[in-house]
Curated annotation (Swiss-Prot):
Motif (Q motif): 14-42
Binding site for ATP: A58, V59, T60, G61, S62, G63, K64, T65
UniProt region (Disordered), positions on chain: 532-576
A GO CC term assigned to this protein in UniProt: 90S preribosome
A single GO BP: assembly of large subunit precursor of preribosome
Name recorded for this polypeptide: ATP-dependent rRNA helicase SPB4
Its biological purpose: ATP-binding RNA helicase involved in the biogenesis of 60S ribosomal subunits. Binds 90S pre-ribosomal particles and dissociates from pre-60S ribosomal particles after processing of 27SB pre-rRNA. Required for the normal formation of 18S rRNA through the processing of pre-rRNAs at sites A0, A1 and A2, and the normal formation of 25S and 5.8S rRNAs through the processing of pre-rRNAs at sites C1 and C2.
Residues of the Helicase C-terminal domain: 257-419
Amino acid sequence: MLIARNFILMSKSLAWSQASLQPWIHDAIDSLGFRSMTPVQASTIPLFCGNKDVVVEAVTGSGKTLAFAIPVLERVTKCMKENRGSSGLYGIVISPTRELANQINTVFHTLLQFYPEDQPPIKTQLIVGSLATVREDLNAFAENKPQIIIATPGRLLDFFSSNAVKRSTVEMVVLDEADRLLDISFQNDVVSILKKLPKQRRTGLFSATLSSAGDSIFRTGMSNPVKISVNSNKAESKPQSLTVNYMMVNPETKIAVLINMLSTLQYKKCIVYFPTCASVKYFYSVFQKLHPLEDVNLTSIHGQLLAKARLKAMNKFTEGDVRTSKHVLLTTDVAARGIDIPEVDLVIQLDPPTDPDMFLHRCGRTGRANKVGRAIVMLNNNALESDYVDFMEVKGLKMSEVESPDVIDAYKAFSKNLRNLMLQDRAFHETAIKAYVGFVRYYSKHAATSIFRLQTLDYIGLAKAYGLLRLPKMPESRFVPNDRMPEDGWLGEKIDMNKYAYADPAKEKIRLETMEEEWNKKVNDAKRRKELKVKNEAWSSKNEKKEGKQERREKMKRKREAIEKQIMNESSDEETVVDWKDLVREKKQKTSGISGSFDDL
């Protein structure tokens, strides 16, 4: 069922011939092989063409791009006729990523190939960061005079800062992946852009998970919008042609399991989602050096690549010939939204994304347009992560379990090769550590915090999966049980880090020079500490001698004073004794004198 505000449309696809469109658009649709409209197209195109603002929520792969591209081209064609071919900016499509913007631009170009040559041409311009400067974009705009702009928010806001861009003629604005454009990352830029545009315009919001945008929708300036929701009364939030499986895996064997699936499963093109840019760069390098995959054409893109490199890699994967080999794209969520790559029939997620809505977008890169597709997510083999299955079922996505392949022998062989590769180049180990630390940070940001908890993460198994020689020192290591923590963090045989060299001679030279400087600094510091200690000891000894001398002086003084006092006391007693003896002697003399006088008588 389709719910469009207060009325209901049957989810039956309609023939394109029943749609009131420009003849050249009918020719384009017929040539592209589309025999009937999808439900979202059948409901949206008449309303969006008929001066209605629309809010469209439909599952991935349901044909939303054509649902807004055709109304935009219809409106631009009418404006061109009304203005007798006069050029002006009539339509704007805003996308959150360069890749999606480039894809939308390609869809417009495909349709415009059927535009009548005797009419003034309709032109589009792609305005995204890194491909060109703002000045170059402005020069191209002034020279080509496009009627339609497909852009990313940041660059478009910079573009509109120039008075050379006349915005008063804009008739239609489309926000593709609107929930992403209205979240905290882009909302301010998008709202600022919309405020610069005429209020009397038609606005369309399109996404697979628009409900998460919440009240932000009301900041887009829409007038009495019509909400269109495809299959909103069904529990399933994925296309029926898409099968979603989950697999419980021990963390250390994840890469071995991935290699097994990429080697044994039947598919044409596969997208493998890694959690971070660092992990994409690291494992792409591992696969390039160890060559564990035969007859597989490997490509990688991530958010840290420059725009030109990203578009080149995406085009390589998109245009890959499936008749000659399998094609695998290692990527992050930069390739999760809106990207429509033909013949992608397998999606593998090493770990669930931090945002549950992104899980649906990742899975939706396959099983598009009623084609059969399969998505597999690996969950760490513990009780908590298994709860993610129930968590997603509440959100309308049912998953069935598939058994993990037996990869013990393959894991041991791969780990041995990876360790040997590590020992050849210190830089490779530093890249692995960066990817490992990035994953731990990524894991801590999960929305489902009750399921993905740092306390329950298997850090040892994860470190082995990344091929680390030694656990890095980080706060989260406190969650590793003491009985599992290896001695000094070594995950294998201990190596001498001073002799662990870079393969790049220039980097190794710098390392050795730095190590020598640090060693000399340590020696000099130790020497200075020793000298300071001796100096301190000398000063301390001198001070002690001085204090001892002073103490002896005071002691001698006290002793001298005591002796003098004693002498004084003794002198006083002797004088008393002498006086007494003198008196006795004097008395004796007197007595002797009297006795002599009697003798004379």
